[in-house]
Amino acid sequence: MPRPFGSPFRPDKPLGERPQVRPGSKPPLRVLATTLWEYPSQHYDAFVNEKGEVVKSKFGGRTAGSGGAMQGHKEYVGASPSWVIWQCLMRYTREGDSVLDPMCGSGTTLDVCTDVGRKGIGFDLAPTRPDIQQGDARVIKLPDASVDFVFIDPPYSTHVDYSDDPRCIGKLDASVEPQKKVEHYYDAMDRVIAEIHRVLKPKRYMGLYVSDSFRKQKGTVGGVFMPIGFELFAMMQKRMRAIDIISVVRHNQKLDRGNWRKAAEEGNFFLRGFNYLFLMRKD
């Protein structure tokens, strides 16, 4: 399968064998070739560019505290893995392309764009820094067909308290039945996806990073499972063409906590071990 737009990612130097994934290590990022993605950290220190050269991140030591690189901010709960964004940009964009993140959080996407020479555009209901514009992803303040790529990591129902803004989609419960007077999580996300389709240029791509969700609930045997990934994928397919589905391994310290594992075993439910990355194209 040819790379989109004749992407120049053809390293002059051989990539060699895939580095072993070891907890705590941060090997330079390289473009991954399978639909199972794994990296031992949320953030990267360096990456291999289009010429096969190892390039250090411009954000080394800025917020990490230990001298390692940190794209976005370490204190932001629910931050996107910067290495996943890097993989998307290296495959589906070129230098100088515009990249939109309509739920920009702590600005991770903008930092990755800076590293690889893309023009980052970020909106958020509660901006955390000056280069993120205030805005609702359900009404993106951009012209039609104006951006080259969109990355979005939306709330997975109510699992994280992102802000005090009552409009926040993270306050909408994906497990409840829709009500006439209250916007439902899936209705809100359908509006977001419609806006992404509107602002994305034809023949360009988007990536949506999301997880299903599970919540224990009194009176419900086995708790409540929310197949958020499947629901959002179905919404996107109504407007765009599916390119692929990536399974991203989650390296979350909470998954290794004995009490969490014990609760999952005794309660007969599963801890979330992976996220989806849905890749779509606007035809």
Task: Give, region by region, the residue ranges found by the protein language model.
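Class I S-adenosyl-L-methionine-dependent methyltransferase catalytic core
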Residues: 1-283
